[in-house]
């Protein structure tokens, strides 16, 4: 079975964020906006896309979600966006956040930054932190590429 690893980056600010709202309230809010999405198919290269909601839907529909295992860190978030905003439902889902919590409990931490450090997978950048309060239109091409 093919795997599709996915990671959405979305708009947030000091008052509108996952630390202030439930996942559902955040994703269903009128302020919600996808900045971009990264998808990696099986062993291939990661593809990063940023565009309008319609163009993002077209990009996402280019993958065979119905016959693939979708992998995400905090899959509840990414799969809810995939389903509620783009009407895409993968055949199977794997959540690396749940896996890491089951394996490491609180010893390592569940953040991507902590897990990357623990498994020597390189450093997670601070692009997401620097995106506070920025809409997709606020990014230049270079900033989006670094995201």
PLM regions: where:
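Entry/capping segment at the start of metal-dependent catalytic domains
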Residues: 1-32
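Active-site-proximal helix-loop-helix substrate-binding element of RNase H-like nuclease domains
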Residues: 32-39, 43-147
């Amino acid at each position: 079975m093919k795997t599709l690893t996915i990671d959405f980056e979305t708009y947030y600010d000091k008052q509108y964020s996952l630390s202030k709202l439930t996942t559902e309230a955040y994703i269903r809010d009128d302020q919600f906006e996808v900045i971009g999405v990264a998808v990696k198919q099986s062993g291939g290269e990661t593809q990063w896309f940023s565009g309008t909601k319609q163009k993002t839907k077209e990009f996402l529909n280019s993958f065979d979600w119905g016959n693939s295992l979708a992998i995400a860190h905090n899959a509840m978030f990414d799969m809810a966006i995939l389903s509620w905003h783009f009407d895409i439902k993968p055949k199977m889902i794997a959540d690396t956040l749940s896996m890491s919590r089951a394996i490491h409990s609180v010893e390592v931490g569940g953040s991507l930054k902590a897990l990357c450090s623990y498994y020597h997978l390189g450093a997670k950048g601070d692009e997401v932190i620097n995106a506070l309060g920025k809409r997709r239109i606020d990014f230049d091409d270079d900033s989006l590429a670094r995201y």
